[in-house]
Curated annotation (Swiss-Prot):
Lineage summary: Eukaryota, Fungi, Dikarya, Ascomycota, Saccharomycotina
Gene Ontology CC terms: 90S preribosome; nucleolus; preribosome, small subunit precursor
Superkingdom of this protein's organism: Eukaryota
Function: RNA-binding nucleolar protein required for pre-rRNA processing. Involved in production of 18S rRNA and assembly of small ribosomal subunit.
Example of a GO MF term: RNA binding
Keyword Nucleus among UniProt keywords: yes
SUPFAM superfamilies documented for this protein: ARM repeat (SSF48371)
Protein name: Nucleolar protein 9
Span list, region Disordered: 1-30, 651-715
Protein species of origin: Candida albicans (strain WO-1) (Yeast)
A Pfam entry, by short name: PUF_NOP9
Length: 715
């Protein structure tokens, strides 16, 4: 007797087909595809935490090879024209039609889908968007699909703005194009409506998305789009969109953003209502305890920071802020005090507090309340917490009232040398922010800040009477030249730490000219080979360039010191001029040699001496032009006129200027000599004209008559 079939499968399949999570593509998988673990193909599996996990099927080997090759072709981008590339993209999209969901959940094919979305036109974008409908939640929680979804959301925001700003003529032209295209009837729905339908899919899952590794990034992007904020790049190091690992991965797979990233988009009025609903939905699922837990959660904290930043657009009560902190009218609370103390001492918590202080979401009175109740009486103690509390103090310097800022400066400046650690590389940022705060307060206590920094970085340097035996401790302690990439022959890229230190020294030189003088002495104390290496270094060359500045009304001792510094460059000019970094330094020497025409002539002569090498170099030709070397070679008088013009600009002697500077004694003496010479020339000219006149009179016979009259008059 034959084996009887088990009954009820058709009915079971029909019931599954009516379920909302059913995916028809999955049910029609090829028979040669094997599925591990025998999971239900189209079931939406919700775990206890409410995270959906829909299985969309596997990509078979033949499809995988094709899509892998297509991804490689797009990555190389060896197309001769944009039309050729667009044709290739169209063919790949045709091949991928109906398979989008299983492609985005595959590690290799998800990269292909991301590239296709970046290059797709508006109709293709809408088509892909529609394929994801009813599955956006599952994609947001997926490791690979979430990245594809983020790219799709950014491009969708750009398309929404374009549809909003379209003129009637553009709309008519678009309608004609759609009529000419196949399947145009499927793309007549506005992108705004498609986007709102997707937003509705996410609403039941918002609280689950907040602390999920992948969905939280999608949620943050949705909030940014709804609020009309700038959508950050997904590859830059300071991007708020992706995690550090994700940004590194994108650089490795060479997926670059298009012009839709790093900008804000115009949004319709309906988006503000959707943002309000999102905020209300999230806050309904939170209480004070859970909100505070999220604020110190590694994944949930950035989402909460963003919600606090944008809630003011739709909620005047600032519900998220008051869910975490007490109202501004309330006094000190022991539970809140413990929570704030934890924020001030823990890395994630301190980053959360710093972020909500720095962004424009919280009202100033909220921040001022927290500061006065829990931080004001221990500013110095918090500044000593080099990995947590110090960042809160730095943020407060630019958010509090001027009186409170000066109070913080008064507390920290006397102890600044103790707070900075050279060995452990701590609190350079604090010194940076103190300088910025001092500048914003009209250089408040500048001399004390500079003295503290010299105590830390150059304890043996005499600020008032610098001597010739000054060591290199100042630039060594700040730049950490020993152990840096300076002088490496392996083409090592300068590190981020070197860039940070170089910028700090540049800021010091802008802040006070004493730091410039100290840097000059340190340059002269360096071996010439080491100094030249700095000029060729990608980061330290900027330090050399920024040090080549001349102070107005420069005293004579400083001018002599400037001449001594210029002597270091002797014999190195041509090499620097032909280098991408050094050429900028040679350009700066034109202004640095003001009032020193002999040194200008020496540098120009050095360039002329090896003119063939200079002119062969791209950078050398720029230096040749900026130094006016053609005039130096052919019209030396005009070149000297350029120097004279520069000196007049330095002294402020222009035709329109009404103020006259006090002239130096040597200038007054030169003017007297010139005036005396002019008088002597006039007297000589008059004598010569009188002699010529007498000779003429003698020749005509009128001289004796005049002579008699003169004698008669004298009698």
């Amino acid at each position: 007797m034959g084996k009887t079939k088990s009954r009820g499968r058709r009915a079971e399949k029909k019931n599954k087909k009516n379920e909302p999570g059913f995916n028809e593509d999955v049910s029609n998988l090829d028979s040669d595809v094997t599925i591990t673990n025998q999971e239900p193909l189209s079931s939406s599996i919700s775990s206890t935490s409410g995270i959906p996990n829909t299985f969309f099927g596997l990509v078979d080997n033949n499809e995988l090879d094709y899509f892998k090759q297509a991804e490689s072709t797009l990555n190389i981008n060896a197309f001769e024209t944009d039309e050729e590339r667009q044709g290739f993209i169209n063919s790949v999209l045709d091949e991928a039609q109906g398979k989008e969901l299983k492609l985005v959940t595959n590690q290799i094919c998800s990269k292909l889908m991301e590239r296709l979305i970046l290059f797709a036109n508006h109709n293709q974008l809408k088509k892909i968007f529609k394929q994801f409908q009813n599955h956006f939640v599952s994609l947001a929680f997926h490791k690979y699909a979430s990245h594809v979804l983020e790219t799709l959301l950014v491009r969708s925001a750009a398309l929404i703005e374009k549809e909003l700003t379209q003129t009637d003529e553009e709309k008519l032209e678009k309608a004609e194009e759609e009529e000419a295209e196949e399947n145009s009837l499927n793309n007549d729905v506005p992108m705004e409506d498609l986007f709102i339908s997707m937003l509705n899919e996410f609403k039941p899952h918002l609280t689950t998305m907040i602390d999920h590794s992948y969905a939280s990034h999608v949620l943050r992007l949705l909030i940014l789009i709804l609020a009309g904020k700038e959508l950050p790049s997904s590859v830059t190091s300071n991007s708020t969109l992706r995690s550090k690992k994700s940004k590194i991965a994108r650089k490795m797979i060479e997926i670059k953003d298009n012009e839709d990233f790093d900008r804000a988009f115009q949004t319709p009025q309906s988006f503000k209502n959707e943002l309000r609903e999102y905020c209300q939905t999230i806050i309904a699922g939170l209480d004070t305890k859970s909100a505070r837990e999220l604020s110190i959660h590694k994944i949930g904290s950035p989402v909460l920071q963003l919600l606090i930043q944008v809630e003011g657009l739709v909620d005047r009560e600032r519900s998220f802020w008051h869910l975490i902190f007490a109202k501004d009218s309330e006094g000190k609370d022991s539970v809140e005090e413990s929570f704030v103390e934890y924020l001030l001492s823990e890395s994630v918590g301190s980053h959360f507090l710093e972020s909500i202080i720095k962004n424009d979401g919280a009202r100033p009175k909220y921040i001022e309340r927290l500061y006065k109740l829990y931080m004001k009486d221990r500013v110095l103690k918090l500044a000593k917490r080099s990995t947590t509390g110090v960042y809160i103090i730095q943020a407060l310097l630019f958010k509090l009232k001027p009186v409170e800022v000066e109070y913080i400066l008064d507390q920290i400046i006397p102890e600044l040398a103790e707070l900075i650690s050279i060995a452990e590389n701590q609190n350079l940022d604090l010194a940076n922010k103190l300088i910025d705060a001092s500048i914003s307060r009209g250089n408040y206590r500048r001399d004390e800040i500079i003295n503290q920094l010299f105590i830390k970085f150059a304890p043996n340097y005499d600020i008032e009477n610098p001597s010739d035996n000054t060591s290199t401790e100042f630039i060594e302690n700040i730049l950490q030249l020993t152990g840096s990439t300076l002088g490496n022959t392996r083409d090592d890229w300068p590190t981020a730490e070197e860039r940070k230190r170089a910028l700090f020294l540049e800021k010091l030189m802008e802040y006070d000219y004493k730091c410039v003088i100290c840097t000059w002495f340190n340059f002269m104390a360096l071996p010439i080979e080491r100094f030249v290496q700095m000029c060729f270094h990608g980061v330290f060359c900027h330090v050399v360039e920024k040090a080549l500045i001349v102070e107005p009304e420069e005293p004579k001792p400083i001018q002599i010191l400037r001449k001594r510094l210029l002597n270091i460059f002797q014999g190195q000019i041509v090499g620097l001029a032909c280098n991408s970094y050094g050429s900028h330094i040679v350009d700066s020497l034109w202004n640095f040699t003001v009032l020193l025409p002999m040194y200008k002539d020496r540098i120009a002569s050095e360039l002329l001496g090896d003119s063939h090498r200079v002119k062969e170099s791209t950078y050398g030709r720029l230096v040749w032009k900026n130094w006016g070397m053609e005039l130096f070679v052919r019209k030396k008088y005009d070149w000297k006129a350029l120097i004279k013009q520069q000196e007049q600009e330095y002294y402020g002697e222009t035709e329109d200027s009404t103020e006259k500077r006090t002239k130096k004694p040597i200038e007054l003496k030169m003017e007297r000599l010139a005036e005396e010479k002019r008088r002597q020339e006039e007297m000589a000219e008059r004598a010569q004209s009188g002699y010529t006149k007498r000779k003429l009179e003698e020749a005509t016979g009128t001289a004796s008559e005049k002579k008699q009259k003169l004698r008669g008059r004298r009698r």
